[in-house]
Amino acid sequence: MSDKFKLLLKQIHFPQHEEAYNEIKSGSIESVKLFKSKRQWFFVFSFRNLLSYETFTLFDNLLHSSFDSLGAKVSYMINVEDISCDQSLLEAYFSYALDILKSSHFSIYSLFSNLGIEISNNSISVKAPAHILRENLHERFIALIADVLSNVGLSNVSISVLEDKEASSSLEEAYETNKISLQEEAESQARQALQSIVQSSPVPPPQKHQAQNFAEKQSQRVASFDKAEITPMIEVNSEENRIVFEGYIFDVEQRETKTGRIIINFKVTDYTSSFAMQRWVKDSEELVKFGMIKKGNWVRVRGRIENNPFTHSLTMNVQDIKEISHTPRKDLMPEGQKRVEFHAHTNMSTMDAIPTVEELIDTAAFWGHPAVAITDHANVQSFPHGYHKAKKAGIKAIFGLEANLVEDKVPIVYNSENLELKEATYVVFDVETTGLSAVHNDLIQIAASKMHKGNIVEQFDEFIDPGYPLSAFTTELTGITDNHVKGAKPLVQVLQEFQEFCKGAVLVAHNATFDVGFMNANYERHQLPTISQPVIDTLEFARNLYPEYKRHGLGPLTKRFGVALDHHHMANYDAEATGRLLFIFIKDVFEKHGLTNLEQLNTELVSDDSYKKSRVKHATLYVQNQTGLKNIFKLVSLSNVSYFEGVARIPRKVLDEYREGIIVGSACADGEVFDTLLSHGIDKAVEVAKYYDFIEVMPPAIYAPLIAKDLIKDEEAIEQLIRDLIEVANRLDKPVLATGNVHYINPEDAIYREIIVRALGQGAMINRPIGKGENAQPAPLPEAHFRTTNEMLDEFAFLGKDLAYEIVVANTQAMANQIEEVEVVKKDLYTPYIDRAEEQVAEMTYAKAFELYGNPLPDIIDLRIEKELSSILGNGFAVIYLASQMLVNRSNERGYLVGSRGSVGSSFVATMIGITEVNPMPPHYLCPKCQHSEFITDGSYGSGFDLPDKECSECGTEYKKDGQDIPFETFLGFDGDKVPDIDLNFSGDDQPSAHLDVRDIFGEQYAFRAGTVGTVADRTAYGFVKGYERDYNKFYRDAEVDRLAMGVAGVKRNTGQHPGGIVVIPNYMDVYDFTPVQYPADDVTAAWQTTHFNFHDIDENVLKLDILGHDDPTMIRKLQDLSGIDPKDIRADDPDVMKLFSGTEVLGVTPEQIGTSTGVLGIPEFGTNFVRGMVEETHPTTFAELLQLSGLSHGTDVWLGNAQDLIKEGIATLKTVIGCRDDIMVYLMHAGLDPKMAFTIMERVRKGMWLKISEEERNGYIQAMRENNVPDWYIESCGKIKYMFPKAHAAAYVMMALRVAYFKVHHPIYYYCAYFSIRAKAFELKTMSAGLDAVKARMEDIKEKRQRNEATNLENDLFTTLEIVNEMLERGFTFGQLDLYKSQATEFLIEGDTLIPPFIALEGLGENVAKQLVAAREEGEFLSKTELRKRGGLSSTLVERLDEMGILGNMPEDNQLSLFDDFF
């Protein structure tokens, strides 16, 4: 005790004889401050340990009372060296903190003092209703409590406030109930007041209509509701009463409270904004009155707008509601006079369009259009759905795409001649213009440098007055002002002088097509000769000479080569810089390629892949007939596989090669006809348009963004462009089609596209900002909704009625009539051909059956094989079975077991030929010696593994036991004609080899990974909306955010591949008969190509093999390698293994030691928290019950709210509840139902259709079930199920799980080694190697974080690992340190009872580095940390981490030994 502290204790009369004195005397005063003016003292005390609460309160009271007696104030802070405390002490201090708040912050104290509090291990969790969390009141509360606790020494206590959902619900209900009761009370008081007035008033003379009855009042209320003024939602931003909205319900949720009341929460939009709405109803009977509140309905609502304290947003409490009719847009033209849309995008246009193809086709059909075209950007992924939808809707679908057309080779030199590059004279020039169109914009500067052998010999620089003020955009871009051009020479004079300046020279420009195009257009306009001398384009020169550079613009190139460019976009500076670059290029092209002649640049430098840098132009391609469909599939494939560069490109020569059966349209403003017309005029456009079958024109509104981009002056210019496009077509006698460039259905949907497109960011071309600085904004998007015929005619009314009708209706109908109906998706299954597949399957089946069951076969086996083979061979499925068998057999030969998934284990043929281990026959005994068998067919056993041990009645050999009693119908359907879906679980280590086996068996050109299409997910859509809100200064209420996110979700974002699915094309066809192909995620370096279509779209037409990677086979292989035990020899009914499911004794530990009451931690299928809970509730003892658990855990609404309750209430047992789908059919057949009906009931239940089928059908099944004594609880259970797990799948999983469990019980060190090597996802070596206490402490730490929802995904994975570490340590095994010379790269090493971790278990050390480190140590010892870094490939951080863990011992920093080291 310090002297000052001892003096203080004496002055406050702290009793020295009390126990408290012995505790407090370790204290000291660290510092003291006196604020004289305030007569206030502030102490900082220090104690070794946290004071007991009794001692603390005694000290606190004496301290304050002593200073109070002196008329002074005192405050203090306590620092504690050891701040550990038990729960009761923390609770006491927490109560003290609340008392402190009571006097200083009573409002917060009163708010929180009655909340639920959970205290444990330096952690305080407070449970609070949602509105407290939403108002952020808890943040202030936490800060205040934390301050008080910190001042008394508890600075390390974490405090969190979690939502008390039960309290939230109760408060919300109470709030509504109280509000209703207040309303009722007010109405009652009003009635009483009215009655009092009536009673005190003289009785009026009798009237003919004395009083209105209730019905009349009600009708008046309804009439007022019907006539009420409708308020747009966007106008309501505060609480208001009796507001009336009309809108569309886009989301509905109902929930029932504990008291039986029901709240209907729904969201309505009028497309100006959206509102959340609420309606409370007393019970389910009253709920019927509000049946109109369902998604998709239009309603009129009246109610009060209130700020809901629970959602913290404006919400309408609905008083009146009625369904209203909503008239969608209609096409008003008569039948036969309706247009065909030839340019429409669906949500498969990547991040660019909104409607599904179904919505597009439904709209066209509703309007009575005879056909509609699908033209997504560069893909045809909506074809299959469009094909099916069009057939259903009775409308012709025209299948097309908007392709990215590129030139095959872009020349470097135009008008090439035989000239030596070093000897030629060059005129390097640049022009500045008022815009990009040589037709609609004007020259304002021509500048040039005449150069010879790298020297400037003459210069040209003239401004040109366009005759009107320059736009701000032009001045900002070029730096040229009106003052520059004012008084300049006439244009003709400048052109003539420039032609004279260029005589005898080679012209040079960067992006020469623009500059030359502008010059030629002006030459032609003034009857001057166009450019005929050679022209070098330095942009293409750079692209071909330096293909490794990503950017070849003038700015990036001058920076790279150190060429001055002081004023980019002023012609004189640009021209001189381009000239300097030219001579660098001439020097480099000689040094790199030996080229010296101008002609060689085109013939020898332009590469075959110059299409990669070629400017993309859009063209619309349409399938005209079946040949065209296959050719489009080829073009899409080639564009994605052979010519992909940023986007899928189609070189012109490739389109020419596959043009048969395809109609080519000129597309949009990004098409080359439109671009040529805009840039070079009608004559040039006519030349370009010759390539196309028809010319597209679009409504002026579609071209409007070009005005914002300064490419077109105004709307009048747009109309003239459209007339010019029609003139181009007329000169060539080609039809003109008016198309809408559709990107969404209705005008109000434009916001969805706006959000999606802006989410691409400013790097996307469509979002390139116009202007600079704060004013920079992307160009507006066009009005691209699906237009009706009359709307389209209105758009083109400026052309005159007849011409508008011709291009909108007549020509589109005529073109649609030229297009034939095609078959996009085939009707039948086309399996590959394998010689003698049917014979091989049959032979292998019978051979194995004879080997196991003898010859002749038992009738039950013979009949099952005959039944199955009849379906398999008769429907052409033999090749699917044989292919699967070959794959499984190859993996087996490599030493891996293969697990089956799905229902393939329902097929006995699959068992016999080795596809699956699951035997679907009824439970039976089988003699391994004499093949005698006994079958149990009365349903008394659910699995043959549960039969009691028995000796063969014929030869006395112990029987083997097998059979899971699974009907074949669950695999191929009742009639055996359902396409088999064989899913197989290969070892993750062997999966790549299994994939390659498919290629080897069927051929690389016939095997493709199953493609997938990734779309914008709900959460991502929400993020896009919030991002748009932020970036564009919008504000949306929550309901509107939800509405916008729903509109945005589902748009294509990327492509991918199924993790194990491989599609096999029959070898007598090619892939383009079914689908285009591509690379996953546009990764042209991927090893496999994928189907372009989502594989689900063609899975009934081609063979799909699911070759999945799984840990179980890998783990089994590891255990076999460690132990030498063949996993196939492990019994499925090992009694010690079964004990794992009822306790922990078999592991030699107590439940308290490992934190769970069973031994299933780390056992596949049973080790998750959810399934462990099921195991603890049910304590299964048989294999059949484990199958039940597997089915129950994988199903939906099979366990929770169903089987769990039946078992708890004693109505059924684990054995008798519905667990797997097949159990229904088997149980019902044993009960006496017809097999066909039993199968149908099973199918209805497993797909969640029981309550969706007609009441008549369902009642028929129920009657049959009751007639056969099926209990009511069983029937009710069927009605709750949404999805069921196949028994065969469960059996395969459980068999694998029990093999792993066998090693856990009987060979634990092998088990733990395999588990950590293969299954563990996260490691923390410092903790794992530090012993039990450290492991348990870290687990507690993560538990606390989980309670506060603060645990990271990594920590959650780590917790799972630590559970197994803890169990291993409790069983007497140890976890060793990393060892630089023992640890392996990726797998744990066994040393006696100790596991040595591998290098990859160290955080931040990857597999490749781990392998490099192991290889390096084989070469010799590491003599220093420097050597370890260099040879081992370790970073400095990793070396430091190893050193901190003590793994490097005394390893020196480098190899240079001190001269004196040897003396010591």
Curated annotation (Swiss-Prot):
Signal peptide: none
SMART domains recorded: EXOIII, POLIIIAc
Superkingdom of the organism of origin: Bacteria
EC number: 2.7.7.7
Location in the cell: Cytoplasm
Chain ranges of the Exonuclease domain: 426-582
Principal location listed in the UniProt entry: cytoplasm
Gene3D superfamilies, A to Z: 1.10.150.870, 3.30.1900.20, 6.10.140.1510, Metal-dependent hydrolases, Nucleic acid-binding proteins, PolC, middle finger domain, Ribonuclease H-like superfamily/Ribonuclease H
GO biological process terms on file: DNA-templated DNA replication
CDD domains the UniProt entry points to: DEDDh, PHP_PolIIIA_POLC, polC_OBF
InterPro entries: DNA_pol3_alpha_NTPase_dom (IPR011708), DNA_pol3_finger (IPR040982), DNA_PolC-like_N_II (IPR024754), DNA_PolC-type_N_I (IPR028112), DnaE2/DnaE/PolC (IPR004805), DNAPol_HHH (IPR029460), DnaQ (IPR006054), Exonuclease_RNaseT/DNA_pol3 (IPR013520)
Catalytic activity: DNA(n) + a 2'-deoxyribonucleoside 5'-triphosphate = DNA(n+1) + diphosphate
A Pfam short name: DNA_pol3_a_NI
GO cellular component, one term: cytoplasm
UniProt entry tagged with the keyword Transferase: yes
Enzyme's top EC category: transferase
GO MF terms, alphabetically ordered: 3'-5' exonuclease activity; DNA binding; DNA-directed DNA polymerase activity
Keywords noted in UniProt: Cytoplasm, DNA replication, DNA-directed DNA polymerase, Exonuclease, Hydrolase, Nuclease, Nucleotidyltransferase, Transferase
Keyword Acetylation carried by entry: no
Purpose: Required for replicative DNA synthesis. This DNA polymerase also exhibits 3' to 5' exonuclease activity.
Family: Belongs to the DNA polymerase type-C family. PolC subfamily.
PANTHER family for this protein: DNA POLYMERASE III POLC-TYPE, DNA POLYMERASE III SUBUNIT ALPHA
Name of this chain's protein: DNA polymerase III PolC-type
Origin species: Streptococcus thermophilus (strain ATCC BAA-250 / LMG 18311)
Annotated gene: polC
